[in-house]
Amino acid sequence: MTSRRWFHPNITGVEAENLLLTRGVDGSFLARPSKSNPGDFTLSVRRNGAVTHIKIQNTGDYYDLYGGEKFATLAELVQYYMEHHGQLKEKNGDVIELKYPLNCADPTSERWFHGHLSGKEAEKLLTEKGKHGSFLVRESQSHPGDFVLSVRTGDDKGESNDGKSKVTHVMIRCQELKYDVGGGERFDSLTDLVEHYKKNPMVETLGTVLQLKQPLNTTRINAAEIESRVRELSKLAETTDKVKQGFWEEFETLQQQECKLLYSRKEGQRQENKNKNRYKNILPFDHTRVVLHDGDPNEPVSDYINANIIMPEFETKCNNSKPKKSYIATQGCLQNTVNDFWRMVFQENSRVIVMTTKEVERGKSKCVKYWPDEYALKEYGVMRVRNVKESAAHDYTLRELKLSKVGQGNTERTVWQYHFRTWPDHGVPSDPGGVLDFLEEVHHKQESIMDAGPVVVHCSAGIGRTGTFIVIDILIDIIREKGVDCDIDVPKTIQMVRSQRSGMVQTEAQYRFIYMAVQHYIETLQRRIEEEQKSKRKGHEYTNIKYSLADQTSGDQSPLPPCTPTPPCAEMREDSARVYENVGLMQQQKSFR
């Protein structure tokens, strides 16, 4: 497991329920310290719109669920039950699934806070990307709830006087919502502490001065807190001219990584294929290019089209889920590539096409019209396309097309083209709402079609707007799957798609627009969740135990783990004598064991 941010060190059972119900989805979970048994912990899981609480015992030798498997650390216990679906069950056999960690809110929106990062990972980051005086703050792994200040103290080669890489780690204690380094002044926030020691450097016992010169910033963010990150990125960056914002700084750092993605593009460079490229230097990587299989065997270049498969690379914990959505990023059609375009759509069983450009912009051809007029039928080489109907929405036109092979009527399938018409000739849209509504329609259409192939996305070059739409869609899919408290990383996602097609997301404006679109999506989603919870929970007593008390005590084996239902919120109290902690006590509730 790469993160332990599901641990919430300072919340009660009531607060855990509120978090899971307002910010989580079914399958979301968190862990927290037990209030009734100090030293123990509680696992709180959202299931069927309610919350189950499971007691975790810490014996001093191991962690367990009062029986069953034993683990050396809390993280190993949680990881085990996340990975081994079906091991966590109620008495009646109902499975309790740990799918989506509900991450603890970061204590600061400062970009030098890296959240869950091990000491070794911090040293590697500071050695590879930092210089003398670079620093970051991270969560303590050995003392949950505390933090660590990691500072590079070697020279700019990463070496101290003895020739070794030197990174110093300073424990930051958090007690009674105050922060200190084990003595001296106490601060109200991590930011106040860091700012103090930037001006007043600490000195190690051996005399080394810990100078906090420049932060080593992270790009990871809890999606629910994107508003704070956008606010931070909108501030002036720490540059000499003081006119560049954090967005520029982050995008420039991303641009400097392009040298790591110099994959071969030999097929696009072949003389026979040059006239199939709209721009001579914007070519598909060989390792991800779409290879056309139905060409003339006597014409070796008939397998070429300027297009790449884009596969999102993010972890999923869902069982029995549909295959992850994939994309084809391609250029706008040329007159001599329209036939190949339809061959590709048919071969890949693509049912949705997203067009993000007008045919002509500022007097220049961006994409030839590759579809027939409404109600018309047209043949494109071996492919036949019939335009069944067109309908206009506020920002886009939807075309229902029928695609088949000439002479093979039984191969006909429906293809939906979503033509976004309101992207401005210069820059990006002022309001991301239109793009989000558009992508929502595209998502629902793709989801409604059984076994649909990749979504085809194109603009003119197939990298700028195309990359922007794809990255936004990938990030929103992650949030849909994992909930608003998942971690997202915009630069990392762009780097991932750039590893499959060169140059995806072209400008700082497009980069900023991605953040704005995700922020708008999160704000809208949170408002909807809050309104749903208000209407569902007002005066409603909920429980996740749907069977009688007799059912609870029947059976040959003790459950793994026993769990307690959530009681009415008005009756919140704790009973330390109970083995399984809950935020309330149901009348005459008996132990499951």
From Swiss-Prot:
Residue(s) carrying Phosphotyrosine: 62, 66, 542, 580
Effect of residue 308 to D: In NS1; common mutation
Predominant location category: cytoplasm
Subunit structure and binding partners: Interacts with phosphorylated LIME1 and BCAR3. Interacts with SHB and INPP5D/SHIP1. Interacts with MILR1 (tyrosine-phosphorylated). Interacts with FLT1 (tyrosine-phosphorylated), FLT3 (tyrosine-phosphorylated), FLT4 (tyrosine-phosphorylated), KIT and GRB2. Interacts with PDGFRA (tyrosine phosphorylated). Interacts (via SH2 domain) with TEK/TIE2 (tyrosine phosphorylated). Interacts with PTPNS1 and CD84. Interacts with phosphorylated SIT1 and MPZL1. Interacts with FCRL4, FCRL6 and ANKHD1. Interacts with KIR2DL1; the interaction is enhanced by ARRB2. Interacts with GAB2.
Post-translational modification: Phosphorylated on Tyr-542 and Tyr-580 upon receptor protein tyrosine kinase activation; which creates a binding site for GRB2 and other SH2-containing proteins. Phosphorylated upon activation of the receptor-type kinase FLT3. Phosphorylated upon activation of the receptor-type kinase PDGFRA. Phosphorylated by activated PDGFRB.
Organism: Homo sapiens
Tissue expression remark: Widely expressed, with highest levels in heart, brain, and skeletal muscle.
Protein name, UniProt field: Tyrosine-protein phosphatase non-receptor type 11
Summary of the function given for this chain in its UniProt record: Acts downstream of various receptor and cytoplasmic protein tyrosine kinases to participate in the signal transduction from the cell surface to the nucleus. Positively regulates MAPK signal transduction pathway. Dephosphorylates GAB1, ARHGAP35 and EGFR. Dephosphorylates ROCK2 at 'Tyr-722' resulting in stimulation of its RhoA binding activity. Dephosphorylates CDC73. Dephosphorylates SOX9 on tyrosine residues, leading to inactivate SOX9 and promote ossification. Dephosphorylates tyrosine-phosphorylated NEDD9/CAS-L.
The EC number(s) this enzyme carries: 3.1.3.48
Protein family according to the UniProt entry: Belongs to the protein-tyrosine phosphatase family. Non-receptor class 2 subfamily.
Disease: LEOPARD syndrome 1: A disorder characterized by lentigines, electrocardiographic conduction abnormalities, ocular hypertelorism, pulmonic stenosis, abnormalities of genitalia, retardation of growth, and sensorineural deafness. Noonan syndrome 1: A form of Noonan syndrome, a disease characterized by short stature, facial dysmorphic features such as hypertelorism, a downward eyeslant and low-set posteriorly rotated ears, and a high incidence of congenital heart defects and hypertrophic cardiomyopathy. Other features can include a short neck with webbing or redundancy of skin, deafness, motor delay, variable intellectual deficits, multiple skeletal defects, cryptorchidism, and bleeding diathesis.
